[in-house]
Amino acid sequence: KIENVEPFLFNLFNDPAILNLPTILRYPLAKLISNRRAPVAKKIYEELGGSSPILKLTKEQSEALAIKLNQTETDSEYKCFIVMRCWNPRANDVIKDVQSFNPEEIILMPLYPQYSAATSGSSIKEWKDVCKKNNYHVKTSTICCYPTDQNFINAHTKEIIKKIKDL
């Protein structure tokens, strides 16, 4: 939503992986940057219909993935939880739901195929920090960094070729 743009930007720029400064400097700088960038960002969001499509699309992707996993792997129940890095739902918002589900193992899968300390690295770190803060210990692995995975490339190639044929 438009009213969430500035707090989203603040969360983004207050991340030590984005601005590697002591908190005493990073916090006011994040406030300044988010305040100055918010008007331009709000105009962009207005052009997108008033909000970012990312959460809606991520929910759809999550639901489709859970259905496919549960159809393919019938010996276990799979559930996908969405955690956003700079806006809701944050790791702190989701951990109770994960604990209630009580998985034997958690597989973290950032939607960024490439590794970057400021994106996938920061997201993984936040999840681990929240687990530690909540004294939550469960086997956790990460699917990270798959930009050259052949299946990933094939899926993108297939969609690109479809678009080219539509031109």
Question: Residue spans of the language-model regions?
Answer:
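Active-site-proximal alpha-helix that buttresses catalytic centers in soluble enzyme cores
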Residues: 1-167
